[in-house]
Design a protein with these regions (language model features):
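Primarily extracytoplasmic ectodomains and periplasmic/lumenal surface modules that are beta-strand-rich
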Residues: 40-45
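A short, amphipathic beta-strand motif
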Residues: 33-39
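Positively charged n-region of N-terminal signal peptides that target proteins for export
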Residues: 1-4
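Short, solvent-exposed loop/linker segments at the N-terminal edge
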Residues: 25-28
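Tryptophan-paired
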Residues: 48-100
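Extracytoplasmic electrostatic interaction patches
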Residues: 84-148
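Bacterial signal peptide processing site
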Residues: 19-21
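C-terminal motif of bacterial Sec signal peptides marking the signal peptidase cleavage site
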Residues: 14-17
Length: 148
């Protein structure tokens, strides 16, 4: 009988010690926003055909007028604007993407930074592109913006 009680105590201690601790933390960085801007009539990238120069691109936060960091990738006639700053925290962003001080389109994103099951990640609740026609290629994660 004494052994049974000790055995039960040992089992109950063992079971109460089991927690859902995270031995491995995981993190998935937010997906960047990538934009290829093309001529609506020809479908040709406006930086590849030299209609515009990338040095005249501005990304402006419409909330406070501040400039937003971005990258411009220009390799082998692949000219893409990339914004990597969205989704690192829970936020709503409203950006104006401009070339030569002309607004090409606006980007609205409702982003949520979450931690579930020991993993941190971003969820985009809403994404809106306004003032331009566009297509989204889910496989490439690329928005093609059509301008006149």
């Amino acid at each position: 009988m004494k052994k049974s009680i000790i055995y039960l105590l040992f089992i109950s201690l063992f079971l109460t010690n089991c927690k859902n601790d995270c031995n491995k933390l995981c993190f998935t960085p937010p997906e960047p926003f990538q934009f290829e801007i093309v001529d609506a009539k020809t479908g040709i990238n406006v930086f590849t055909n030299n209609t515009y120069e990338s040095r005249y691109i501005k990304v402006v936060n419409l909330k406070d007028g501040s400039r937003v960091d971005y990258n411009f990738i220009s390799e082998n006639n692949y000219n893409v604007l990339t914004i990597n700053t969205i989704g690192w925290e829970t936020e709503i962003v409203n950006y104006s993407i401009q070339i030569d001080d002309n607004e090409i389109f606006t980007l609205y994103v409702d982003a949520e930074f979450l931690s579930e099951n020991c993993c941190s990640f971003s969820r985009y609740n809403e994404i809106k592109i306004e003032n331009a026609q566009y297509n989204y290629d889910k496989e490439k994660g690329l928005y093609t913006i059509f301008i006149n």
